[in-house]
Design a protein with these regions (language model features):
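N-terminal subdomain of nucleotide-sugar transferases
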Residues: 1-55, 95, 119, 381
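A conserved mid-protein helix/loop that constitutes part of the nucleotide-sugar donor-binding site
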Residues: 19, 217, 224-240, 256-262
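Donor nucleotide-sugar binding/catalytic pocket of nucleotide-sugar-dependent glycosyltransferases
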Residues: 56-59, 123, 153-208
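Nucleotide-activated donor-binding/catalytic signature segment of Leloir-type glycosyltransferases, i.e.
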Residues: 262-280
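Short alpha-helical donor nucleotide-sugar binding micro-motif in glycosyltransferases
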Residues: 279-280, 287-292
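Aromatic "clamp/platform" in nucleotide-sugar-dependent glycosyltransferases that forms part
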Residues: 300
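Short hydrophobic beta-strand element within catalytic cores of glycosyltransferases
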Residues: 317-322, 327
Length: 397
């Protein structure tokens, strides 16, 4: 089929949104589709160096706005302006596509303009329907006011979001990555809603069988140090674990909360047991996943998690909060899920108890094997095959 892909960020050699855009595009082309991709001009050089001349990349740009110069609400406004530009650019090409697939950004709130084209739109996978638990406002600090605004925009004010309503109603299929987002799009009258994990892996990421690592257990945390990611909660939970057994915590990621995390480590007397790596290139992260004993994910608001899937792909058992997208994934013994406590003061201890279970139980290898088995179902070739079946359905109707 002739498929138009919208991927705001797209380049090889990355994880997250940037890698998703590239891997969606290449996987669909490898499946046999004739793929045209719209992405931001910021990625032109990296895309062209990727060596995929079989894919027709285009780079609509917003003049006068450097990519990455705007953050927060200004960044969202720039993205919406790019969306309008991308639609106008696609329409000006005068081509006939069989299907349009918007893969990034995958946001409930930001929509897509491409439903206006004369081809069925597959929208997503998207997230964004989840909101942060109010009892945990202290982890957000000064950002809690902004978080309350986002919660309102996701709740009662979402009905005022014309971009959301138009996209959801006009899309042939909406792919959602968690149940909260599913509920939101159904309220707006989406015609066809299906679950698909937002993230995927290249096939070569999947690990072979692993043995429990020897030596002092290593707990790995990966992500941007943002309030909603709750990196200080990770340190607090590790402090509780450290009271009961030897262990090390390795944290890969940077962001505005890094100084606060450093201070928390010092205040809890953990400097000898915690390694703060800062930002680590995606291609280097594989080594940390492969050498660690357990992955810790304690985000207080997330649609799903690329890092969790990456850890599973390397056979790394996990401890995580039973919340939002992580509550929806069915990974069996690969992860210990910890229910959110009404009393925030109890949560570090509960996370520590779950971590101790993963690290000391006799079934580490079985947990690792379950992680690999689940992650193997979410490679990009598998996602391209699933998307292709949807394309067949929406073009036949």
């Amino acid at each position: 089929m002739k498929v138009l892909v919208s991927a705001y960020q797209c380049a090889p050699g990355h994880g997250g949104e940037i890698g998703n855009g590239w891997m969606w595009s290449t996987a669909l082309a490898d499946y046999g589709h004739e793929v045209t991709v719209l992405t931001h001009a910021e990625f032109r050089d990296r895309v062209q160096a990727g060596g995929r001349s079989d894919i027709d990349f285009h780079f609509p740009d917003i003049k006068g706005i450097p990519f990455g110069a705007l953050i927060g609400l200004d960044g969202y406004d720039a993205y919406r302006r790019w969306q309008n530009t991308a639609y106008e650019y696609a329409a000006s090409l005068g081509r006939d596509w069989d299907v349009v697939h918007h893969v990034g950004w995958g946001s409930l709130h930001l929509g897509s303009r491409l439903w206006r084209l004369d081809a069925p739109l597959v929208y997503g996978p998207i997230g964004g329907g989840q909101t942060a638990p109010g009892e945990y406002w202290r982890y957000f600090g000064r950002d809690w006011v902004m978080e309350l605004g986002r919660s309102a925009a996701t709740g009662s004010l979402l009905r005022l979001n014309g971009w959301t309503k138009e996209t959801v109603r006009e899309a042939a299929t909406v792919l959602v990555t968690n149940s909260a987002t599913e509920a939101a799009v159904r309220r707006f009258g989406a015609k066809d809603v299906r679950y698909m994990l937002a993230e995927g892996l290249p096939e070569e990421w999947i690990s072979g069988q692993r043995q429990r690592p020897s030596g002092v257990p290593v707990v790995l945390w990966v992500g941007r140090m943002l309030p909603r990611k709750a990196p200080t909660l990770a340190v607090q939970a590790f402090a509780e674990l450290r009271k009961t057994m030897p262990a090390r915590l390795v944290m890969a990621g940077d962001g505005p909360l890094l100084p606060q995390v450093q201070a928390t480590v010092e205040n809890l007397g953990l400097a000898a047991d915690v390694d703060l790596l800062g930002r680590v290139p995606w291609t280097t992260l594989a080594q940390y996943y492969s050498e660690s004993s357990m992955f810790l994910f304690c985000s207080l608001r997330d649609s799903s998690s690329a890092q969790f899937l990456e850890a599973m792909g390397k056979g790394l058992p996990a401890t995580l909060l039973d919340l939002h997208g992580m509550a929806d994934v069915k990974v069996g013994i690969a992860a210990e899920k910890v229910p959110l406590s009404r009393n925030p003061g109890e949560l570090p201890g509960r996370l520590a108890a779950a971590m101790r279970t993963v690290l000391t139980a006799d079934d580490w290898e079985a947990r690792s094997a379950a992680a690999i088995e689940w992650a193997s179902e979410h490679t990009f070739p598998s996602k391209a095959a699933a998307a292709s079946r949807i394309y067949q359905e929406v073009t036949a109707s």
